[in-house]
Amino acid sequence: MEALRQRIEAAFEARAEITPTTVEPSVRADVEKVIAMLDTGEARVAEKIDGQWHVHQWLKKAVLLSFRIFDNQVIDGAETKYFDKVPMKFADYDEARFRKEAIRVVPPAAVRKGSFIGKNTVLMPSYVNLGAYVDEGTMVDTWATVGSCAQIGKNVHLSGGVGIGGVLEPLQAGPTIIEDNCFIGARSEVVEGVIVEEGSVISMGVYIGQSTRIYDRETGEVHYGRVPAGSVVVAGNLPSKCGTYSLYAAIIVKKVDEKTRGKVGINELLRIVD
C-alpha cells in the first residue's frame, strides 16, 4: 500500500502533463486500482482511528487524477444516454450481485464507480459521487446528494433533497462526515468538511459550512465545523454585537432524547432487501 501511495503522490505532482493519451500505463493501472479499492470499501478517503478522523489525502489525489486520465465515454442509462469520464457503479450488476450486496437502488438513482455502498442501504432517486463511502443501513432519500469523498456512517437517514458536500470543487482539505445514527432533515446542506458527530439530528432546512456558527443555547458555546454528538440542531439567527441586525446560525436546542428518537428512528421494514 505504501508503494502505491508513493506512486500516486508522484503522479499527482506531474498531473499537468497527464492526459488520456499521454498517461503512462502504470499510472493508469495505479489509479484504476485505487478506484476499485474505493468501490469495494477496501480503502476509504477518511476513517476514524482512536476516536479521531484521519484523511488519506493520497486517495483523494487518485480520484482527482482519474479525471485527467479517463476519457469521456457513452454511458447507457434508462431511456437515455450520458457522456462522462466516470462509469456508473452498477453498470455490470445482475440480480445475484444486488442480492449478495444487500442493497436497494430505486430508479433513477445515480451512483458513480469508485463509491462504496454498504449492506442494507436504500438509495432512492439520489446521487452518490465517486470516492464517497455510505455505510450499512443508511437511507439516501429522494434527490439527496452525497458529494465526492463524503463519509456517511451506519444507520444514517439523509432526507429528501439533502446535500452533503464533496471535496473536489471547490477543493477541500477534508471530506464532509456524517457519523453513525444521524438524521439529516429535508433540504439541509452540510458542506466544507463539517463533521456531524454520532447520533445527532439536524432539522430540515439547516445549512452548515465551516464558517457557520453552531450555537449551543444551553451552554452559550459556539462551535465551528463540528456538530457535537447527540445534538438536535435547528436553523436560527444570532444578534449582531451592535444589536441592529442578526445573522444566520445553526442552533443546538437540546440533546437527543427518547422523544426525538421516536420521531426520527430507523424503520427496519424499509431496509429489508431479501
From Swiss-Prot:
Its EC number is 2.3.1.117. It is found in: Cytoplasm. Substrate binds at R104, D141. InterPro entries: DapD_Trfase_Hexpep_rpt_fam, Hexapep, Hexapep_transf_CS, THP_succinylTrfase_dom1, THP_succinylTrfase_N_sf, Trimer_LpxA-like_sf. The keyword Transferase applies. It is an enzyme of class 2 (transferase). Its main location: cytoplasm. Homotrimer. HAMAP family: DapD (MF_00811). This is 2,3,4,5-tetrahydropyridine-2,6-dicarboxylate N-succinyltransferase. The lineage of its organism: Bacteria, Pseudomonadati, Pseudomonadota, Gammaproteobacteria, Alteromonadales.
